Design a protein with these regions (language model features):
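N-terminal secretory signal peptides that target proteins for export/translocation
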Residues: 1-10
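Serine/proline-rich low-complexity intrinsically disordered segments, especially terminal tails, linkers
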Residues: 6-7, 21, 94
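Hydrophobic membrane-insertion alpha-helices, especially the h-region
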Residues: 15-21
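Short, intrinsically disordered, charge-biased short linear motifs at domain edges
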Residues: 13-15, 36-37
Length: 161
């Protein structure tokens, strides 16, 4: 496994996969995505099957179209896309199995060898309730990009071969 110093931000697909895993641990809480549309296209190195470092969680990341990923995690389906803000690789992840279809926000890091993906969800306690639309959320994330409380615990996945 590459040390964290050699990890680079790459491939939202992995971010999406991570987002899905994080969603299983914390519910989707936001009415709107970070950005109203994707900020980049699907990246092939993010597609595939991922397994958590402890071997207990499995995630499948597939391409729906040029910009959207579909993630299958623990029996649930999620729709995800890149929502980069302030040079940070965010993804907007929508729970498509629930009636309210709310979003979660996740930051991802892909190792240089593209075999390891690290995900961190945005801490829902940090974003004020009045940040109700995509442009307000994106501005808030940009202004708070260096806030150490912005992101929650990291989860690591390894690509299945």
């Amino acid at each position: 496994m590459a040390p964290s110093s050699t990890l680079i931000y790459r491939g939202a697909g992995f971010g999406i996969a991570v987002s899905l895993c994080i969603l299983a641990f914390s519910a989707c809480e936001y009415e709107d995505p970070i950005t109203s549309s994707p900020t980049r296209k699907v990246q092939e190195q993010l597609l595939g099957n991922w397994i958590s470092q402890d071997g207990k969680e499995h995630m499948r990341v597939r391409q729906l179209d040029d910009n959207i990923y579909i993630v299958y995690y623990d029996g649930d389906l999620f729709r995800a896309y890149h929502s980069d803000v302030a040079d940070t690789p965010f993804v907007s992840v929508q729970d498509i199995n629930s009636d309210d279809r709310k979003y979660a926000y996740v930051v991802w890091k892909l190792s240089e060898d593209t075999k390891h993906l690290r995900l961190r969800s945005v801490n829902h306690d940090v974003i004020p309730n009045e940040k109700k639309n995509s442009s307000a959320i994106a501005r808030f994330l940009e202004e708070n990009a260096t806030n150490p409380d912005l992101l929650g615990e990291e989860i690591q996945f390894n690509k299945e071969t």
